[in-house]
């Protein structure tokens, strides 16, 4: 490095050399370094190429979006029960923006055309399955078909069932606004007494009684939109005897749903059956894909809004995503069936079920199959002696308490606020109201009464028993008996005088011991004695006149 002499210091010279701004002062022909214009040229070319690239990408994205909207096909559907897949094309702008208006389920057994709408295929299935059923099951199946023909299920877009008033009520009351419908009055005895199929307690606790044959109940409102990723509920099996003759199911259904049919056996319903079967619109044989339920288990159902996915949990563990692309309003449904009246769940039907591995192993080993007496054979519900169903109690949790499924607790998948925006009534006995002058309360009850004798300013005044108002009169009497007259003596004397006067009056006017006839005779006798007798007076007068005449004659 060269150090420049002169006024410029060595440090400044080094800086000039480093930054390239120093020119030798001794050079007679200083040469200015050429100016490089390539930087601006490179920057302009880079910007042009970047703009072209973005334009091409935008054109590609627009073309892809147009293809997906108008020419694309949805992904293949998957049948969770049969394992078969089928593809269906649903076009429209709703699919592109994630709305499920076109398809209800990717599961082909839920609502895809050609499944239950194909009358020929349905007729063939009926010819194959109905002979395996009992008379009671066939009757339920036919009633269910007729019910849904007369009352078609409401298959509309999610969130369109409620009106403005219902939304406001749910917003105000929260989970407190939900409850299960009561039992229909269709089960009576020969005397006309109502025999309820189930009882609803505390709005969300359902108990299926011994009188139940086949029934179900729905929640009064569909699944809500809680502004989270999903909505979720759980059902705890609080009471369910071992080897019970009651079959129950928990699931989601559309409205209206046959009140005499358990969820999963009619159109547009999905349910987890207590036998472990997963039923999706399936009144016939279903596959056992889930664990058998027993007392103490907790079953959960969830619905993810974005993909329309329905998933199931068992004791806090996620089992499977059952269906996809569900875009309709679904209701929580509970149902129970008396298996004694069915062939499907009695001995013959259980032996024919390929999923009953334990029974088949027992038969292959030559062991006798042990079943409860209630499901050994098919009973007729029209018999005079009905078969009592085992009671089953189910408790539904919509988020009023913690979930067993951890994800639902962390992400708050409940139905909403427990108490709503209105909340609970204020506590009028709290410490915060003691500072409010408007709602200040009075003295503590009971009040302090004055019990001192002679205290007229007390609550009841100066009152003495058996004396009454004579006390004041006694105080005004003149002093006697040596100037000593007590209040008690005056009151006693006044009371005695009153008794005497009243007794005399009663004897004179209210004597009921006298005979009325004697009274009349007595009055007449008294009147005769007091009234003068005219006849006797005349006789006396004549007698006196005769004596006077005789005296006068003698004198003459």
Swiss-Prot record:
Glycans are attached at residues 163, 212, 338, 510, 523, 528, 533. Residues 528-542 have a biased composition (Low complexity). GO terms for cellular component: endosome membrane; fungal-type vacuole; vacuolar membrane. Its main location: membrane. Residues 127-323 form the B30.2/SPRY domain. SMART domains: SPRY. One of its GO terms (molecular function) is ubiquitin-like ligase-substrate adaptor activity. Residues 81-556 are lumenal. Keywords: Endosome, Glycoprotein, Membrane, Protein transport, Signal-anchor, Transmembrane, Transmembrane helix, Transport, Vacuole. It is found in: Vacuole membrane; Endosome membrane. Pfam families: SPRY. Residues 500-556 are annotated as: Disordered. It is a single-pass type II membrane protein. The keyword Membrane applies. Residues 543-556 have a biased composition (Basic residues). One of its GO terms (biological process) is protein transport to vacuole involved in ubiquitin-dependent protein catabolic process via the multivesicular body sorting pathway. Belongs to the SSH4 family. Components of the endosome-vacuole trafficking pathway that regulates nutrient transport. May be involved in processes which determine whether plasma membrane proteins are degraded or routed to the plasma membrane. This is Protein SSH4. It comes from Vanderwaltozyma polyspora (strain ATCC 22028 / DSM 70294 / BCRC 21397 / CBS 2163 / NBRC 10782 / NRRL Y-8283 / UCD 57-17).
């Amino acid at each position: 490095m060269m150090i420049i002499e002169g006024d410029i210091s060595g440090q400044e010279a080094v800086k000039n050399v480093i930054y390239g701004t120093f020119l030798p002062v001794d050079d007679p022909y200083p040469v200015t370094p050429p100016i490089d214009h390539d930087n601006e040229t490179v920057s302009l070319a880079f910007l042009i190429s970047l703009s072209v690239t973005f334009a091409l990408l935008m054109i590609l994205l627009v073309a892809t979006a147009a293809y997906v909207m108008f020419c694309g096909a949805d992904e293949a559907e998957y049948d969770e029960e049969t394992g078969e897949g089928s593809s269906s094309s649903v076009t429209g702008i709703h699919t592109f923006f994630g709305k499920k208006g076109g398809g209800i389920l990717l599961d082909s057994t839920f609502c895809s055309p050609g499944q239950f709408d194909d009358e020929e295929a349905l007729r063939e299935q009926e010819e194959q399955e109905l002979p395996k059923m009992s008379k009671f099951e066939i009757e339920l199946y036919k009633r269910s078909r007729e019910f849904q023909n007369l009352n078609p299920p409401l298959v509309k877009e999610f969130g369109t069932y409620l009106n403005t008033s219902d939304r406001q009520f749910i917003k105000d009351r929260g989970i407190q606004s939900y409850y299960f419908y009561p039992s229909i009055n269709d089960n009576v005895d020969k005397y006309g007494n109502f025999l309820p199929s189930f009882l609803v307690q505390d709005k969300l606790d359902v108990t299926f009684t011994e009188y139940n044959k086949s029934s179900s109940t729905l929640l009064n409102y569909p699944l809500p939109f809680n502004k989270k990723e999903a909505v979720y509920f759980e059902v705890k099996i609080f009471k369910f005897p071992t080897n019970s003759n009651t079959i129950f199911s928990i699931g989601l259904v559309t409205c209206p749903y046959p009140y005499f049919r358990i969820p999963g056996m009619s159109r547009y319903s999905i349910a987890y059956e207590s036998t472990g079967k997963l039923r999706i619109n399936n009144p016939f044989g279903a596959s056992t894909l889930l664990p058998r339920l027993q007392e103490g288990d907790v079953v959960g159902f969830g619905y993810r809004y974005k993909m329309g996915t329905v998933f199931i949990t068992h004791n806090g563990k996620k089992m499977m995503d059952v269906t996809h692309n569900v875009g309709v309003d679904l209701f929580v449904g509970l149902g129970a069936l008396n298996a004694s009246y069915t062939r499907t769940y009695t001995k013959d039907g259980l032996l024919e079920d390929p999923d009953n591995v334990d029974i088949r192993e027992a038969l292959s080993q030559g062991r006798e199959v042990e079943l409860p007496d209630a499901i050994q054979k098919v009973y007729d519900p029209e018999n005079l002696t009905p078969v009592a169903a085992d009671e089953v109690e189910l408790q539904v949790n919509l988020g009023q308490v913690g979930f067993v499924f951890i994800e639902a607790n962390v992400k708050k998948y409940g139905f909403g606020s427990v108490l709503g925006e209105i909340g609970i009534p204020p506590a009028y006995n709290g410490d915060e109201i003691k500072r409010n002058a408007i709602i200040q309360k009075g003295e503590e009850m009971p009040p302090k009464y004055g019990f001192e004798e002679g205290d007229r300013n007390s609550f009841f005044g100066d009152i003495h028993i058996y004396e009454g108002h004579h006390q004041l009169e006694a105080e005004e009497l003149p002093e006697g008996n040596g100037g000593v007259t007590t209040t008690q003596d005056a009151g006693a004397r006044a009371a005695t005088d009153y008794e005497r006067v009243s007794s005399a009056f009663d004897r004179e006017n209210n004597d009921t011991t006298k005979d009325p006839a004697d009274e009349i005779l007595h009055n007449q006798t008294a009147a005769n004695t007091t009234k003068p007798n005219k006849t006797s007076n005349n006789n006396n007068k004549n007698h006196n006149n005769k004596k006077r005449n005789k005296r006068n004659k003698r004198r003459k």
